[in-house]
Every structure is written in C-alpha cells, then in structure tokens.
Design a protein with these regions (language model features):
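C-terminal catalytic/acceptor-binding lobe
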Residues: 138-209
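Short aromatic/hydrophobic "clamp" motif used to bind/position activated sugar donors
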Residues: 65
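A recurrent flexible, glycine/aromatic-enriched loop bordering the glycosyltransferase active site
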Residues: 50, 94, 100-101, 111-130
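Short beta-strand/loop segment that forms part of the nucleotide-sugar
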Residues: 9-21, 39-43
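Short, acidic, metal-binding catalytic loop of nucleotide-sugar glycosyltransferases
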Residues: 1-9, 33
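Conserved donor NDP-sugar-binding/catalytic core segment of glycosyltransferases
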Residues: 77-108
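The conserved acidic donor/metal-binding loop of glycosyltransferases
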Residues: 69-73
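Glycine-rich, basic loop-to-helix element that forms the pyrophosphate-binding segment
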Residues: 43-60
Length: 209
C-alpha cells in the first residue's frame, strides 16, 4: 500500500514491536517495490504503542508525518490527497472522519459519518492521522497502548492546533471478526446501526482514484 503511493515524495519508517526482522530482507523487498528511503526501528514488547509512534516521529526527516495502519487499505493517491487537504485547509492535522469500512465477516463495505468531510473538526480516524512533524514533536503521543490517537488529537486541539477532516476517498478501514486493529470492542451490528451499507465486497474502484 505504501509503495503504491503516487504524486508524493515520502520515506517509509517501520517499527517492529517485540521482534526483529532480517533488515536485508526488508530492504530488498522495499527496493523491489520501488521504495527508495526506508528506516527500520525496533522496540521491546513492553514499550507502549504511543511511545512507539513517538520513536517513529523523532526518526523521521520530513516536514509532515503520516500514520498508516497495516490492517487497512490506502489508495495510491492517499498521501497526495491528504497533503492537498493540509495545503488548502492550512490545518496542522488532517485525516478522515467520513470514511469507508470493510466488514470482513459480512463481506460488506459501509460508509461511516458521511456528513463529516471537508470540515474543520476535533477528531479524525487514527489510521489517517497526518500531522506537521513539528507539532508531533512538540505534542507527543501519550505513552499508552489504548486511546493514544484520541489523546494526541485532544492535546493538539487544546494547544491551538487546527484539525481538518478531508474527503472520504482513498482509504478503507478493515474490520475483521476480531475487531479493528485488535483495540476495539464494538461489534459489526453496532457499526451497521450507525452507518449505511454502500455495497457488498470491497469495490475499491469506487473508493480509490
């Protein structure tokens, strides 16, 4: 997903949590996919997720950092779309509030919060957080493993940062039977009750452009 990004210059930072892969294999794989800049970090199992994110932010070299979840799907223009939103909104943090979600157990794609796009906000979905690096350095993620995204957004807004919800496209959150990224307790029935079914299957051609 990262390697498929177009119209955006980027470096990839990967942090493995509690295990150490073979760097040469990862670098070879990255090169085969066209990724020119790759940094590999590791953290012990006891390091909270929020602190892992801070390690990645501090190791980055760009002006903007983007958090991407390997469980979810990102279209090839995801990064450029987010960067454009940051540019025209002037926001310090951008992301998706209106977004598609694929429910694996039902093979259905739903749309959540369709009215919450193209607007300034106080919340965006964690896997879509893109922030100015200077802000993420000054207001780090809390050293917790649950709620770190929400706390970061809340602290950023309290410090005067501007948050903007971009359009719904180029991102699909994937919900397996075990939950979203293994941190949500919400059920598929609850998600369906507060969303609308757009289509069965993934139909990424409608979402990615």
């Amino acid at each position: 997903t990262v390697a498929s990004q177009v119209d955006a210059a980027f470096e990839v930072l990967i942090l493995t949590h509690g295990f150490s892969p073979v760097p040469s294999e990862l670098r070879a794989r990255a090169r085969s996919l066209g990724v020119e800049s790759l940094q590999l970090l590791t953290a012990e199992p006891g390091v909270p997720l929020g602190e892992c994110l801070n390690l990645l932010v501090r190791a980055s070299s760009g002006d903007v950092v983007a958090k991407m979840d390997d469980d979810d799907l990102y279209g090839p223009r995801y990064l450029s779309d987010q960067l454009h939103a940051m540019d025209y909104s002037g926001a310090d943090v951008v992301g998706k509030q209106a977004h598609y979600m694929y429910l694996k157990g039902l093979d259905a794609t739903i749309l959540r919060f369709p009215e919450r796009e193209h607007r300034y906000t106080d919340f965006v979905a964690g896997p879509t957080i893109m922030a100015r690096r200077e802000l993420a350095i000054g207001i780090p993620f809390p050293a917790t493993s649950r709620g770190e995204d929400t706390a970061f957004l809340r602290n950023a807004a309290a410090a005067g940062a501007t948050l903007y919800a971009a359009d719904r496209f180029n991102f699909v959150q994937v919900r397996s039977d075990g939950g979203i990224a293994h941190t949500w307790d919400v059920t598929s029935s609850e998600l369906l009750a507060n969303s609308r079914v757009e289509f069965f299957g993934r139909n990424q051609g409608h979402i990615f452009w």
